[in-house]
Amino acid sequence: MQNQNEASVRCGSSETAVSRLSLLLWAGIVAAVCWTVADMLLVGFVQTPERYPLLSQTLAPQLGEAADFAVLMQAGSPERLLWGVLPATFSAALYLAAAFGVYRLMRPGRTARVGFAVLFFGYALSPLGHAGFYFTGMVAKVLLNAVLDDYPALLALFRHFYRMLAVHWMASVGSIAAGWLLLLIQTLRRRTLLPRAAAWCNPLPVGTVIAVSCSLFPQSPVAAALGGATFNLAQLVFFVCAAACVRRRGMGMQPG
């Protein structure tokens, strides 16, 4: 009787753990959907530098490496750019929760803790980096219709905004990518609750496939939209696959 009670307790505890893990992974799914839509609205445009010679030629020396960005932002209306930010910033907390889910997928240890830390750090930085596209893009729009005397001040403001955007965006993406790399390594080493084949669903290889595929169609609006959301689309694929694996394997889950 005692053995039956102990087995029942272990079974209930395992079911609770699986339910909690599934909930965290679903938070990642919802966040990835929100951020994918936001990316498509914010940067999912085909580059048309020939339509904006002021930015792509005349002011290009002053804009430097940000000239292409300034041109890209002209394709979206202010309302579209705004809605390209809101779904992402208001769902960022779900990505933070999903980072705990990724941590619980890995076998406890130093690698799992480091992976969680860098993933959480990257997600925490991401709203500022993402919102920076809106503010910098709006300055780029003002540049297009400004009078000559306003150029120096507007160009200086644009460069300051772009620098802030670049620092936070690169730090966020780099940190998140490092977290996914650690998970990829652990998956291949069979030190996660996922099968080794799930390495193909990791955002790094999935994102590479999406980016390369979209680059083959530079004038396609669909490719531009998908390419602009590459990283979040890749994370959506992962969280869906991980949630499916957890649900399928259920209480019998073992690392690798």
Feature names for model-found ranges:
Residues Q2, S8-P255:
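Hydrophobic, aromatic-enriched alpha-helical segments typical of multi-pass transmembrane helices
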